[in-house]
Amino acid sequence: MKFVDEAYIDISAGDGGNGCVSFRHEKYKEFGGPDGGDGGRGGHVYAVADVNLNTLVDYRFSRRHDATRGEHGKGSDMFGAAGNDITLRMPVGTIISDAETGEVLYELLTAGEVVTIAKGGDGGYGNLRFKSAINRAPRQKTPGWPGERKNLKLELKVLADVGLLGMPNAGKSTFIAAVSNARPKIADYPFTTLHPNLGVVRVAAEQSFVVADIPGLIEGASEGAGLGHQFLRHLQRTRLLLHVVDLAPFDDSVDPVAQAKAIVGELQKYDAELYNKPRWLVLNKLDMVPAEERAARVKDFVKRFKWKGPVFEISALTREGCEVLIRTIYKHVHEQQQIEAGPKEIDPRFVEVEGDGVDLTDPRFAPRDSE
């Protein structure tokens, strides 16, 4: 399930330092000659593709990024130090374009790829540069060049890690609004969500996952009822499904267990692979159930539903139980990412060997027949 994540940033590379006008002062030497150094170059702004990131959410809260300017030149032939570079880490697949013209400038397609998105200005020349046979005591210098300044648009096609599954009005939109930066339409009638909504859940610094709120399913979705084919197809590439169930429906004639079974039936009819995907049960609207009845109602639901997988009891409205759920989700998603990445290749030259440092299993050290 792909969405487009966008962010806008303003970047400034550092200006170059100014050149210096200075003359050498030595004892018994009245005219020591020029010794003014050049200014240092300004800091560059780099972008690097980081495989551990999957969204642009950090750049929504941090729009401006400035590198430092180079130091000015000094006397005694001292050149100014270069400004500090800054490196912006972005997910693999990020498209960087000019925010005003829309021109695509860079694409980060491979992990570890580095591009210079703004170059620092060159340092100005000190008067040492202008010394000649004719001009023995130059007083010229040049200012540093300005660094590049750009307004950029970052765009990323995001693959949702987690999909929310459930009947209309089960509280999926309320949940995604409670745990992420998404603001879906929320109301007390079914089919509030008419299009998939994307939310980025930040667990900690540089720890996040993407959750997708799919429009509520109805019976017959596997045959296409209620745009069922389109919505079910969105769930196929997620790593985890959360089956959200309204534990306290307003209509007493509605049986949550029957509704949950209907959803599972639609999954099974549509695609066996989707049905076998990791799925967790999330019992929502816990705040509507009296405290003394909660344990019994949850136990009864799980028993009648014949559920043997993970169960989470939450209230999306009050956020009760949400913190534990999102941290558990992140752990699962992170583990899946590590598995998909595969084992890292290890250079055998750097493998530590116990004992005297000789690997006796190496065929080079096998005993010869003459021995």
Curated annotation (Swiss-Prot):
GO terms for cellular component: cytoplasm. GO terms for molecular function: GTP binding; GTPase activity; magnesium ion binding. Keywords: Cytoplasm, GTP-binding, Hydrolase, Magnesium, Metal-binding, Nucleotide-binding. Signal peptide: none annotated. Residues 160-334 form the OBG-type G domain. Its cofactor is Mg(2+). It comes from the Bacteria. It is found in: Cytoplasm. InterPro entries: G_OBG (IPR031167), GTP-bd (IPR006073), GTP-bd_Obg/CgtA (IPR014100), GTP1-OBG_CS (IPR006074), GTP1_OBG_dom (IPR006169), GTP1_OBG_dom_sf (IPR036726), OBG_GTPase (IPR045086), P-loop_NTPase (IPR027417). Its EC number is 3.6.5.-. Its main location: cytoplasm. Gene3D superfamilies: GTP1/OBG domain, P-loop containing nucleotide triphosphate hydrolases. Belongs to the TRAFAC class OBG-HflX-like GTPase superfamily. OBG GTPase family. An essential GTPase which binds GTP, GDP and possibly (p)ppGpp with moderate affinity, with high nucleotide exchange rates and a fairly low GTP hydrolysis rate. Plays a role in control of the cell cycle, stress response, ribosome biogenesis and in those bacteria that undergo differentiation, in morphogenesis control. This is GTPase Obg. It comes from Delftia acidovorans (strain DSM 14801 / SPH-1). The lineage of its organism: Bacteria, Pseudomonadati, Pseudomonadota, Betaproteobacteria, Burkholderiales.
